[in-house]
Amino acid sequence: MLRLDLQFFASKKGVGSTKNGRDSEAKRLGAKRADGQFVTGGSILYRQRGTKIYPGENVGRGGDDTLFAKIDGTVKFERFGRDRKKVSVYPVAQ
C-alpha cells in the first residue's frame, strides 16, 4: 500500500500591521461663555492655544492661555485694532 505525504500551505498570505490607526483626543477648545452672558469670578470664558483672543477688562490669562473672569459681570467680545479680538467682563450696574 502506498502512503502519501501531503503538505498543505496557507491559502492566505500573512498581513503585517499598519502604522496608522491612532488619533489624539479632542481638546475642547473655544468659547465657553457667550457674548452678553452673566458670569461669576473665576469662570472660564475661552480655552485656546496661543493668544487668538486677548484678555480685556477684568479678564485674566492662565498658564495655558485660557481666559477667565476676574469679577462677576457680563461678558463682552470686542474688536481692537484692525485684526485683533478681546474679551472683557463688565460689572452689572445695580
From Swiss-Prot:
Source lineage: Bacteria, Bacillati, Bacillota, Bacilli, Bacillales
Post-translational modification (record): The N-terminus is cleaved by ribosomal processing cysteine protease Prp.
GO BP: translation
Organism, scientific name: Bacillus subtilis (strain 168)
One annotated Gene Ontology cellular component of this protein: cytosolic large ribosomal subunit
InterPro entries: Ribosomal_bL27, Ribosomal_bL27_CS
Taxonomic superkingdom: Bacteria
Name of the featured protein: Large ribosomal subunit protein bL27
Record note on quaternary structure: Part of the 50S ribosomal subunit.
Gene Ontology MF term list: structural constituent of ribosome
NCBIfam families cross-referenced by the UniProt entry: L27
